Amino acid sequence: MHDDASHSKAASRPDRVNEPEIRPVTIVIGCGDVGSAVAHALHCAGYSVVLIDHADPPWTRRGMAYTDAWYIGAASLAGVDACFCASVRSIPFVLDRRDMIAATTWSWQGVATALQPIAIVDARVVKRQAPAMLKQSGGPLTIGVGPGFVAGLHADVAIETAWGDDLGAVIETGSTKPFAGEPRPIAGAGRERYVYAPRPGRFNTDRAIGECVSARDHIASLDGEPIIAPLKGALRGLSARGARIAVGQKVVEIDPRSDPALCFGLGERPRRIARGVVEALLRRRLLAGSASRGVQRESLHE
């Protein structure tokens, strides 16, 4: 009789073994290589991710980012897909699939109101402007990624983005380092491997990320003005056709190593920054999915 009663109670309990894990929502602002790496890491750690940027984003490292989702509706990065959501109402349907990131042009404030995220990450890495004020009293955890963020002022915590031993460090008191001003050299080439927009306009190109070009090759135009390759190498960065470009904005990056494989996937710097963002959530015990089982925590120190 005792066994029958126990069996009856067990049968009446809901089967929790096959219940899906709860995936708290996170918002990432900026679909460049850093923002995309952050979104990728959060997704792999078990969080639902909404990646936000404005229409026709100008980011150049499209082989290392989800930027193309804003142009063709979908993009893939290191085995994880992003799907563009034209309507804020479609975002929950994409997140419910649990296998992809939702990309949108809706404001982060509007998405936050609708979805009540546990964290908001500004991963635009703005270099020459004051950081955005994300911190909200009683709101979700806010994380500032990039130079000039002051933890406790602009955001709850900040993530260091400058090359060095502190790259990806979680800063809970104080600020990240100021913008250094000069890019890290690759095969001896520094700023000369970039092309910056001489004027505002619409970008047009028939070239592809990873394509190898020679110095002085015509690779694009900006409202009809030719954009010329500054040196020989592979197109690691190239704004998308139709991108809205501001004067002085980076539109082309040449990798002088001429290896197309280096133009795709998660770069070292974005990956380390993304690990820092996940670590910031773990420190606040904002756990989800594999993070709650320690999988992501182990990968933070690889």
Identify the meaning behind each predicted range.
Residues 9, 15-302:
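Well-ordered secondary-structure scaffolds
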